[in-house]
Amino acid sequence: DAWVRPVVAFTQLGHVGWMVSLSVAVLALLLWRRDWLHAAAWVVATAGVGLWIRAIKTSVGRPRPVGGWVPEGGFSFPSGHSAGTFVLYLMLAWLLLPYLRPAWRWCVGLAALAVALGVGASRVVLRVHYASDVLAGWLLGLAWMALVICAVEWAQTRVAGRRC
């Protein structure tokens, strides 16, 4: 089927190899800029969500749907592509926000959200995940990312408070 190829190409934005490569590049840039707090947050966010995914998949052990359009191994719940892309692309957008003009902030944020939601949807379309796997992945990604961002905001407030 002709529609499968573009959907498979799009879902690769959530492939672990691509996400690790992008994560390393972003980390290298943050370290080069000597932005230690955001570098630490980036590692905790991206590596942490991977650890959560692995732990939950192993604990739940839900088999994948039968008859997927592409071969996929491992357990199904939660969707690692969904959780990983949510954290990766939205954290990247959050890191970019201070450097963008206000009009571009919405564009970048919405583009990141569109990629995360699109990758998750592609997993259901390709029949390698149930919708509940994807929803759980998105919620896991959102919760983990929110926790990391709150920790960074708290740390920045504490540091700013000491300077006064």
What residue ranges belong to the model's regions?
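Hydrophobic alpha-helical bundle signature of multipass membrane enzymes
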Residues: 1-75, 91-98, 102, 110
